Amino acid sequence: MKVLFAGGGTGGHLYPGVAMAAELKKRVPGISISFAGTSAGIEATEVPRLGYRLVLFPVRGLKRGLSIRALVENALILGDFAKSLSMAMALVRKEQPDVVVGTGGYVSAPLLLAAQLSGKKTLIQEQNAFPGVTTRLLARMATEVHLSFEESRKFFGGKSEVFVTGNPAREFPAESRESCLDFFGLDRSLPTLLVFGGSRGARAINNAVLKLCHRLEGTVNLIWQTGALDADRMRGEIGTSATRWIGPYIQEMGKAYGAADLVLCRAGASSLAELTNLGKPSVLIPYPYAAADHQRHNAMALVSAGASVMIDDSKIGEEASFDVILTLLRDREKLAQMGEAARREGHPGAAATLAERIIALSKS
């Protein structure tokens, strides 16, 4: 059995494919798995590190604007797409994959299109509540489309082969709240706020939490992933405390979630998959410059479900926003209700479910 994954650029587009690949290896001895990506994406280093074959394509995203420079650049980019499509057609003819799986990013388009034109089975896995243009166009000819949010279904008309299976996410062993708090050296009797803005941090969130710290002191535990760029500045400005853990990156993310009563973070698809799988209430601050504002759509899906509160990036540093966060932290009943709502939106085992669908398609 041969499977080709096409996706990357960011971890959000790569790691769902990696999770599916791992599940396929468990189920199909001797399976051949390859990835298609670009030299500029995270896959250029991660895929070889994980031991998978990587085929690189020159495809890039179009530039916005109508300037002469943008028009010239876009003409070159369209040329790269045509070259990538030709390369993809040749790869599909040579490799004869049983299924091509698209997980988003620029490289998905030429690979999925080449597979569809060659009569191969294709599966699209969409992470976000607001599907991208490529997904919406190629879904028409895809064998199956798998979504992370029920709200996304409306973008695919009457297509019957559309399923809500969730977004493959990291899985963490179950641990007691007390043992997780002990790991970070925090007070078991206090509510705990977990803050992160991605592996590199988020400046707006960090600056807001820096202002919020004086209101948390002595009444709320704080576990704060600042990202590497802000770690020293944040530590230097607020110093140490028995109720704070501050670091550039949280290696033991499962323990951080286990300790947390409330999570403050961006609204990326992977983070939301983890929050819902674990049943964690959240305050979401969508990244305002995400493509097609997709993080706001992601956040609204959880807000509508009663699992989250959304605060605009431009308002996160206001006292009124701090009031919302502190009010939630003091209301255990509300947090429990939000946590249950989050859990109802979760799809634990999404990677395994998708692996089974890929196997079924290869046999059909």
UniProtKB/Swiss-Prot annotation:
Keyword Cell membrane assigned: yes
Enzyme class: transferase
Protein residues bound to UDP-N-acetyl-alpha-D-glucosamine: 10-12, 128, 170, 199, 250, 295
Record-listed E.C. numbers: 2.4.1.227
Keywords: Cell cycle, Cell division, Cell inner membrane, Cell membrane, Cell shape, Cell wall biogenesis/degradation, Glycosyltransferase, Membrane, Peptidoglycan synthesis, Transferase
Metabolic or biological pathway, per its Swiss-Prot or TrEMBL entry: Cell wall biogenesis; peptidoglycan biosynthesis
Major localisation: membrane
Cellular compartments per GO CC: plasma membrane
Signal sequence range: none
Segments passing through the bilayer: none
Chemical reaction(s) catalysed: di-trans,octa-cis-undecaprenyl diphospho-N-acetyl-alpha-D-muramoyl-L-alanyl-D-glutamyl-meso-2,6-diaminopimeloyl-D-alanyl-D-alanine + UDP-N-acetyl-alpha-D-glucosamine = di-trans,octa-cis-undecaprenyl diphospho-[N-acetyl-alpha-D-glucosaminyl-(1->4)]-N-acetyl-alpha-D-muramoyl-L-alanyl-D-glutamyl-meso-2,6-diaminopimeloyl-D-alanyl-D-alanine + UDP + H(+)
Localization of this protein: Cell inner membrane
One GO biological process term: cell wall organization
Positions in coiled-coil regions: none
Pfam annotation, one family: Glyco_transf_28
Membrane topology: Peripheral membrane protein
Record-linked InterPro entries: GlcNAc_MurG, Glyco_trans_28_C, GlycoTrans_28_N
GO terms assigned for molecular function: UDP-N-acetyl-D-glucosamine:N-acetylmuramoyl-L-alanyl-D-glutamyl-meso-2,6-diaminopimelyl-D-alanyl-D-alanine-diphosphoundecaprenol 4-beta-N-acetylglucosaminlytransferase activity; undecaprenyldiphospho-muramoylpentapeptide beta-N-acetylglucosaminyltransferase activity
Function: Cell wall formation. Catalyzes the transfer of a GlcNAc subunit on undecaprenyl-pyrophosphoryl-MurNAc-pentapeptide (lipid intermediate I) to form undecaprenyl-pyrophosphoryl-MurNAc-(pentapeptide)GlcNAc (lipid intermediate II).
UniProt record similarity statement: Belongs to the glycosyltransferase 28 family. MurG subfamily.
Protein's recorded name: UDP-N-acetylglucosamine--N-acetylmuramyl-(pentapeptide) pyrophosphoryl-undecaprenol N-acetylglucosamine transferase
Organism: Chlorobaculum tepidum (strain ATCC 49652 / DSM 12025 / NBRC 103806 / TLS) (Chlorobium tepidum)
